[in-house]
Amino acid sequence: HQFEKQEMIVVCKPEESKMWYEKLWKNTVDLFRSMDIPVRTLECCSGDLADLKVKSVDVEAWSPRQKKYFEVGSCSNLGDAQARRLKIRINGENGKYFAHTLNNTVVAPPRMLIAFLENNLQADGSVKIPEVLQPYMGGMKVIEKK
């Protein structure tokens, strides 16, 4: 099957790696929360980390239908492992050194759509439009059932 998603990739200095990791996963959390979708984060333990990953967090959205959270994104810090494989180096004051790389799945549209509809569906079948999206919907606050 085909799975589409939007990724954010960062190549940075090692000393910036922790800061970027925090920013990236918070971007995903903020995006979902701005659309009134409850989310939580789960930091992966070292035994569950895939190859190359130094640190990883999953972002999960609440599914009212399933009555549980499901994964909608993840963020990983790969340290310098991926940069070593790709030979990505930084010219620093003390010579060349390997960069750090980070990957963040910001959104997988099918999963976001599911979370959006489930969390904004009203009892009468209409869908509430979160305030952040209303300017893009011509000021519409609700999509009415026809």
Protein language model regions, located:
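TRNA-recognition modules of translation machinery and tRNA-sensing kinases, especially anticodon-binding
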Residues: 1-146
